[in-house]
Swiss-Prot record:
It is found in: Cytoplasm. This is Holo-[acyl-carrier-protein] synthase. It comes from Paenarthrobacter aurescens (strain TC1). GO terms for molecular function: holo-[acyl-carrier-protein] synthase activity; magnesium ion binding. NCBIfam families: pantethn_trn, PRK00070.3-2. It is an enzyme of class 2 (transferase). The keyword Repeat does not apply. Pfam families: ACPS (PF01648).
């Protein structure tokens, strides 16, 4: 059963400017393993986190570090803990599906949550 679908797009150049202008933003949005990635990859991961938030109804008090994007042999994966895990479990999410891409200055992500 599909619990929800979320889609988000991020302007890579604008996102990069925000990271430069706000030094603590990278630390607030990303776990240590993500922080070392280039701006294009970070923009795609932020789009994925936004898509996860949309699936979950943009829960109040969501900690951005409670959702991170990993990689396995099949591609990108959604990983959750804490505040995000609690809402996902309450909504019956058992499995996440994620597709990310970037082209022409835009990063995009689509997330499907399955119950």
């Amino acid at each position: 059963m599909i619990v929800g679908i979320g889609v988000d797009v991020v302007d890579i150049e604008r996102f990069g400017r925000q990271l430069e202008r706000t030094p603590g933003l990278r630390d607030r949005l990303f776990v240590p393993a993500e922080r070392e990635l280039n701006t294009r990859s970070l923009a795609a991961r932020f789009a994925a986190k936004e898509a996860v938030a949309k699936v979950l109804g943009a829960p109040a008090g969501m900690n951005w570090q409670d959702c991170w994007i990993g990689l396995d042999e099949n591609g990108p994966t959604v990983q959750v803990k804490g505040t995000v895990l609690a809402v996902a479990e309450a909504k019956g999410v058992k499995r996440w599906h994620l597709s990310m891409s970037h082209d022409g200055g835009i990063a995009t992500a689509t997330v499907l949550a399955e119950g």
